[in-house]
Amino acid sequence: MNALYKKNFLKLSDFTSLDIRNIINIACILKYQKKNKNEFPYLKNKNIVLIFEKQSTRTRCAFEIASFDQGAQVTYLGPGSTHLGYKESIQDTARVLSSIYDGIQYRGHNHETIKNLAKYSNVPVWNGLTEKFHPTQILADLLTIYETLPEKSFCNIKCAYVGDARNNISNTLLEASSLLGLNLCLVAPKCFWPNYDFFLKCQLKAKKNHGNIICTEDIQKGVRGADFIYTDVWVSMGEPKKTWHNRIKLLKKYQVNLKMLLLTQNKKIKVLHCLPSFHDKNTIVGEEIINKHNLDNGIEITNQVFNSQSDVIFRQSENRLHTIKALLLSTLLKEFPYI
């Protein structure tokens, strides 16, 4: 029997290092098959429900197309369209949905919600994003890193994450490092460093897998020798604008710009961004923040750097489709097919 059959994916560490490597390998094959239009619909007659308490572009599209490509049917439940936790308990919702569907994707505000969904569900539950973790994003990032540097093992690759190192992306990168030995440097002001106990736990596991994790405020030290610089937005919709002001003031010097790329001393440096990005004034929010805070050419990343690295950044986004597809096959099929 497939070892991941019916297994929940709430955080990256729910899977083993071998599981993650297998998913990346399966994603590579599925990506090749899609490009060559010779996929087989292994998920025919499967039904999947997507619960989105938070809006989404990439995650929703990736889950829907991954399902459709593999022959599964999808129900989308958007913000405000369920009674989850309001008129109907999470426990009852999980029991109802798992009696109808073969799998449940959840994207929302509270990680405790998805933990409770998984606790009372009889089918696999996948995390499309919570405030603590974003494992489906990091699966795509790991595939992108592997494709970009196929000659290197993860323990010989350095990734510098720059910005707010307390968020769901940095938390999940910490787990990736702990499992795969990816060398990770979190470059941020101390007030934006991750929970110490969680950091220490991941650091110890990373060392066992021949990797290293450090935190530093020193940009030059943090990015020197990096193969990848990873950043994310500094502000999220729904947060008070006062929070935006304080955070931008503290993170301003951590903007990913040409000077930072030069500090890596790596002419082949690549930049990762999970998107969306405030690299220009072409969004209402981006224009408001840039004008109000007198920012030069973007917020967390400059327009120049974003566009020069867009091939990798948008490949990250595309790879969500292939890794999510590999995740669905790995957790929904009792016997894994030869593909």
From Swiss-Prot:
Pfam families: OTCace, OTCace_N. Pathway: Amino-acid biosynthesis; L-arginine biosynthesis; L-arginine from L-ornithine and carbamoyl phosphate: step 1/3. One of its GO terms (molecular function) is ornithine carbamoyltransferase activity. It catalyses: carbamoyl phosphate + L-ornithine = L-citrulline + phosphate + H(+). The keyword Transferase applies. L-ornithine binds at residues 168, 232, 236-237. HAMAP family: OTCase. This is Ornithine carbamoyltransferase. The gene is argI.
